[in-house]
Amino acid sequence: MPANLTEGSFHANQTVPMLDSSPVACTEIVTFTEALEAEEWGSFYSSFKTEQLITLWVLFVFTIVGNSVVLFSTWRRKRKSRMTFFVTQLAITDSFTGLINILTDIIWRFTGDFMAPDLVCRIVRYLQVVLLYASTYVLVSLSIDRYHAIVYPMKFLQGAEKQAKVLIGIAWSLSFLFSIPTLIIFGKRTLSNGEVQCWALWPDDSYWTPYMTIVAFLVYFIPLTIISVIYGLVIRTIWIKSKAHETVISNCSDGELCCSYNRGLISKAKIKAIKYSIVIILAFICCWSPYFLFDMLDNFNLLPDTKERFYASVIIQNLPALNSAINPLIYCIFSGSLCSPCKVQRSQDSRMTYRERSERHEMQILSKPEFI
């Protein structure tokens, strides 16, 4: 049985629970009666379970290996920075997602029933939801950090390291706080079809829809709105500063004035950090948007109970797990030192002045996302 975080109670018509790797999931796919009466549905469901296991194993390996490489890469850096800190936090969150969400889902599919005590059920569900919130709120913290770095660069330099730790501390604190209801809602339970599962213990099925709506807004819609507004302001600031730079350069005849103004421009390192952050956010949106939209439609019974819905749901439910496997790849693309050999150009260094070598060395360091 999968490690669904939002599996609801069985309805009157009895439903076959869905197989998914995500910590939150739609509560049903096809009715239990349909699964018994239609042989093709039953065989399809069983065969796809094997394919799902293969998919989950692949995602698990890529998630653990990829994020381990990222953590090792950030750990071996002698020079740390705010961006190193946030990349590390994101990799830690993704690693725990692989261990607690994906791996437990794989184990559940092998065992069928939930074998552990009720306390273990509640703790596992709680940790799964904590990671669900944390994966989103860490991205919000990263967005706020990038906003201050671009919009208020002078203020940002004062206590930047402390501010980054405070943002991450708030993100994890809110994640643990908002997940507390899970300890009450979920528990070990015998379902109507005889299975013993770690399931939602609702007094009535009508509680499920408002609960899932609240979770969807706290985990996805509200954070996505905040992130979108923040990066909108960041892009606007970059555009305004670039236009001001063009105006000054076109009207400037004094070299010293131009040089002093250039120092106030946004560095290439910060621009690259923004690009890295935006790609991470876009990956999050691509992986989670189909899931939450499908889940909301399903909880309000707006989707038809058809085989096409079954096909779509099985694919969509694996997308959140895919996000944790993609993030290390994005880091690899933006960090040349991780994925390509370092080329030291000694001959060029010998022809450069001390100032040119210093500036190039600084840009080589700052151009990597972990040092921005």
Curated annotation (Swiss-Prot):
Keywords: Cell membrane, Disulfide bond, G-protein coupled receptor, Glycoprotein, Membrane, Receptor, Transducer, Transmembrane, Transmembrane helix. Disulfide bonds join C121-C198. Pfam families: 7tm_1 (PF00001). Coiled coil: none annotated. It is found in: Cell membrane. The chain crosses the membrane at residues 53-73, 83-103, 123-143, 166-186, 214-234, 277-297, 314-334. It is a multi-pass membrane protein. Glycans are attached at N4, N13. Residues 1-52, 104-122, 187-213, 298-313 are extracellular. GO terms for cellular component: cytoplasm; plasma membrane. It comes from the Eukaryota. One of its GO terms (molecular function) is vasopressin receptor activity. Residues 74-82, 144-165, 235-276, 335-372 are cytoplasmic. One of its GO terms (biological process) is eating behavior. SUPFAM superfamilies: Family A G protein-coupled receptor-like. G-protein coupled receptor for neuropeptide S (NPS). Promotes mobilization of intracellular Ca(2+) stores. Inhibits cell growth in response to NPS binding. Involved in pathogenesis of asthma and other IgE-mediated diseases. Belongs to the G-protein coupled receptor 1 family. Vasopressin/oxytocin receptor subfamily. PANTHER family: NEUROPEPTIDE S RECEPTOR (PTHR24244:SF2). This is Neuropeptide S receptor. It comes from Rattus norvegicus (Rat).
